[in-house]
Amino acid sequence: MSNLRLQKRLASAVLKCGKHRVWLDPNEVSEISGANSRQSIRRLVNDGLIIRKPVTVHSRFRAREYEEARRKGRHTGYGKRRGTANARMPEKTLWIRRMRVLRNLLRRYRDAKKLDKHLYHELYLRAKGNNFKNKKNLIEYIFKKKTENKRAKQLADQAQARRDKNKESRKRREERQVVKRAELLRKISQSEKVIAGK
């Protein structure tokens, strides 16, 4: 059998594929070995003596199946783990994810006028200080804080109303005393006049 390395190389260039994908008809070796130009190779391709083999199928079925199982949590036991917990799921990534969730919630509440800017800023700094484990935790804290603020405001209003009432009553008492004193002085002066007239 003659060496068909040249023909294979030319055929791969003509067919625009790798040399492994070129098939040369083993029954027509003598005719193929005579072809030493691209033109003659093209003729042999048209005659069907040289064929471009189809791409070998490399199925991803098993890989997809395995990936699907991993999504469900299979194949992730202690024996399958190579890196540290921090390498597999970095703490920084978890922190960034949590901060984004909490800050988006705070921003949304502030824009919806559920939080004033002072409470927003306080909660923002608390979130940064790792005060809230998750979104639910933050919502509960906001609800509690708003209730406390509302109660404090009510108590402050009640205290102010009481102070105003006491102030008003004190003022009225003083006015009454002034009137009474004036009345008393008038009576005394009248009685003195009467005594002086006798």
Swiss-Prot record:
Gene3D superfamilies: 1.10.1200.240, 1.10.1650.10
Biased composition, class Basic and acidic residues, residue ranges: 160-177
Chain intervals with Basic residues compositional bias: 71-83
GO MF term set: RNA binding; structural constituent of ribosome
Keyword terms: Ribonucleoprotein, Ribosomal protein
GO cellular component: cytosolic large ribosomal subunit
GO biological process, one term: translation
Keyword Ribonucleoprotein: yes
NCBIfam families reported in the protein's UniProt record: PRK08570.1
Similarity annotation: Belongs to the eukaryotic ribosomal protein eL19 family.
Protein name: Large ribosomal subunit protein eL19
